[in-house]
């Protein structure tokens, strides 16, 4: 019976890496740090498809302002969105999590800082779609679009959190 605690400890030590958000577990296919991440900064877990370059650019913008961004390449990004209650009308190409909130799409660092400063009673923020000019979607070939950052409450109701 003395070896049971060691078995429990051993099973904990060899368990696969799992991230839990909103009570859901997500096992990434690959997990790496975005280069330049501040290991002492607030951690953002970014989930994206392997082929999405603008998602990685968004992560780099978050690193630029001091966040520690964990890049999770996922094979089930749509399943993740469904399990987190992110409707298709709010969806974008990537989903991130910070301090218990979801951050869907190309949400600017300024809005994330406001979210973490105010800590509202919401599920998360969303920038639906992929607006040109939003973080990770910058281009010199097209004018930036105006867009809203939406606050999403736990019932799925939305309100404007910020406008750009």
Where are these regions (language model features)?
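Sec-dependent signal peptide recognition
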Residues: 2-9
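N-terminal signal peptide c-region/cleavage motif recognized by signal peptidases
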Residues: 15-17
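A short beta-strand-turn-helix
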Residues: 25-41
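Local sequence-structure signature of Cys/Sec-based thiol-disulfide redox active-site neighborhoods
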Residues: 37-59
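Stable alpha-helical elements in mature extracytoplasmic
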Residues: 51, 58, 73-76, 108-112
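Conserved helix-turn-beta segment immediately C-terminal to the redox Cys motif
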Residues: 59-79
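Thiol/selenol-based redox catalytic cores and closely related redox-interacting motifs
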Residues: 83, 89-164
